[in-house]
Amino acid sequence: TPDEGDWSARRNAAMQVWREWLPVGEQPWKTYEFGDLGTYFRTDTRMIARSKPYWAGDLMRAPDPAKAFADFRDGAWMDPASTMFGTEQESWLFHQFARNKATWTVLGTGTNMGYNYTPEEALNWFSPETPDYRKNFMRQGIAAAKAGLPYNFDNWGGYPVARSRVFKAAQKNDLNLVVVSGDSH
């Protein structure tokens, strides 16, 4: 949000802290091989090159939110140019997939790859004292689900074509893929 300060400054500070406190080095993505048992791919889906995410709140403010969600689902949501990794990292990953011969392939991403949908009854989960902004967030998720969309476009749920490319690359190379991810709250 605008009151949190300049995005670039916050991102740069976060990246500096990440590198100073975690033993990951300067590389934003990397391969770790464990003999023929497994290969782990550490990727970046937050800071480097992903496409700008869409926000359900913007669609809710449209004159006809249901139409806005449907138009988004049938249009921008399916944009083949949309990416979580960026072209360079995605190319690197798919090349690594092609050369990987390990029994297990573990892909680490900063955001969930599974889709999450908000059920209509979710509004009943709140107490009467719950602030409206929280209820409105839930309404956004419900509106998205009614259009067949996941509630969060800021994770892989907002990048279905890019997500499909990852899974197709794993299938093409007959990998036993396990995805581990974070940032679920």
Feature-to-residue mapping (PLM):
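Metal-dependent phosphoester/phosphodiester hydrolase catalytic core
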Residues: 1-185
